[in-house]
């Protein structure tokens, strides 16, 4: 071998590479066109395929030259050093930054704040407070070295059994849009981005990677896309995450009608779209995703880079589509802290953020019932029943979980306000919690990966009449906590999850009988991210407080409400039905099915099972209160409901047209004896038109400041004229019918305080004709 010749060849190659790197443009905000021209096809393909999530099941080896920048982060984009293109880091959310708390060879801890879940945040009906939470989460995202937080969850609560409802805000798109907008604005004010998810109609977790969500264009536009649209137009999120599921037969991540025609052309979106963490699909060509407008494949397979290169060379993929997506990626990258060289500290102000958590979780809690039981005064000792009193759940399972340094349970929260718990009962429960957690870890099904991400629900223990009789004389009152857990990859069941278990029902009845016999109060705390059945047992207790999954300060927040330190002002953002089957969507929803058993996995593969392979949205526009209110169906607690320790008086509302905007105003007075906040919910009843419409629909809302007794505040709420529109499928347009619109101000959807009328002229707005259904569905109608 001629070693001299070989050495000269290697040296020449190295010199050429160095010269090429030196002459190559270095990315900045003003030379993106130049950088794209300088990129090789392989480099362009690399930029469209993410990586870094080495622990993702089935993801295979990630792009080899990447390293982990932030341990536990969800993924990264690829660096191209030759062109000055850095990697960027994305972390899971949205209830806090999901990263590893401990790092090999590092004695420091990297715990993040566990903030209230999405449902709890939305139940504040306080966009200023939600924006403040977003700012805190954005700060932790920044200081822990991440560029994008994967959240917020913008999907609707189509059905109370959806396992991921805890991450989502509401059954209503307006609540979703306004709360989501505030959250995004807060996060992005810190110089980091969000990835609003899951776009779109990710309405169930069962078979979520391939279920076909079949629905009308009207329901799609008015309900499932409306919140996203509001958030995109008002907050400009850096990224949108496309959903796993199909929409009318087409995968969302390869749906050009969704990702380009609607998102970009109709709404004017300028950011990037990235896939949910699916990797490579066997039944969806990669070129279809790129062409559709999916800019980033996450978490990415090395083979996908070559797939893009081959598709361009074979004529299956237009290089113009590749360049378009590359441009969007570069426009995203130059905004990131990592590109700008931000020196993150790894030390956000967790103490300050805990205070924000406590404030927001307290304001999001909803008082469902209060028969002179709250606030508690003069209580020294309570009997604390229910496993979750001692293992209070701060958040849900899966990617939405947060690795936290502590979580305040009910025992600690009560102790902090000077209320003791009966010692023997406390010892029994605390010992059981230790045992049950150890057993759960030992017996864990290896397929149930999500149990390592979050706090699993422990089984309830039976409380005998003898036990209750022993505890009653030692306590001034009883508090029972009923807990529920759910999360990514699984939906809830009716029996034992939506409904009480027999053990739980027996506990409530036995405790109530014993304590009421002695004239003592019984208070129930619901520690759940989702709706539960209450109608069968609510008459047996004196007070019910929905604490949701309120973040790390949960026990303290509950104590703040119980003592009256904070007056409850939370309102339900979803209907609490009498039974789960009262929702018309339940007929088409997955139920009584366990995705983590091999038998069911085999059944699943058959490919045409209702509720699993496809879900027909036959309820159409009648989701949540739109159904119950229009069809006059009784509910346990209506949408928008929530009690206070004080009373409020609503003045006569007024409504005025101001150009393309409509201003609604109402004066609210605190007529009670303690300070409090109240929500004004603005519902609109439309005149009859070509399309059947719900009896009334929420269009906006406002919340007062803390009003002292006798104090008043005038709320002014603004909406656009186009917000009154229904979607006209026949003409692919939004249409406001001419006529008189009734603006109804309520404290909930059933409790209307005043009405004002506004005459509105016809208005239309053309849209793309996208995502039409491919099968005939039997839509629910009030008048057939």
Per-region residue spans from a language model:
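Short beta-strand elements
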Residues: 751-767
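Small side chains
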Residues: 13, 477-478, 754
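Extracellular/periplasmic metallocenter environments
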Residues: 732
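Glycoside hydrolase catalytic-domain context in secreted enzymes
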Residues: 21-726, 735-745, 749, 771-784
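Gram-negative bacterial Sec-dependent N-terminal signal peptides
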Residues: 1-20
